[in-house]
């Protein structure tokens, strides 16, 4: 999956985040959130995704053909939840011709904290007592892929 250009992001896009137990959706255009939805849905992710996508589009007063594409959080996170979101995004790509762009969820979290002349490390809850960690340079470029480790290990490795 490639990245959309800044010019392309002026069009409306549907954001899909199913990487954990929370279903998060938004319609954005030119850097502004037009409508959004976020709710802990746990095991109802597959059943809730399509109706909530329709609701968030209606709240933005848009219809599917008006979208420039789909922005999708490709993780890290729950394998099953990510697959549910990816399947929906790919279905929209195939049925409506919408372009799907994968986003690194950790990089998205790091981005607002970059540009200050220092590295940023993102920690997210994983399974059990483990966490996902990934470090980025001051421009939000990853030093390495996200890894799963214990909190003490992550703190020892943090820049």
What would you call each of these model-derived segments?
Residues 48-51, 87, 91, 108:
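Short amphipathic alpha-helical face segments that pack within enzyme cores
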Residues 3-9, 32, 44, 99-159:
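Surface "functional belts" at beta-alpha junctions
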Residues 13-15, 71-73, 81, 119-123:
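Short glycine-aspartate micro-motif
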Residues 69-100:
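DPxDG-like acidic metal-binding loop motif
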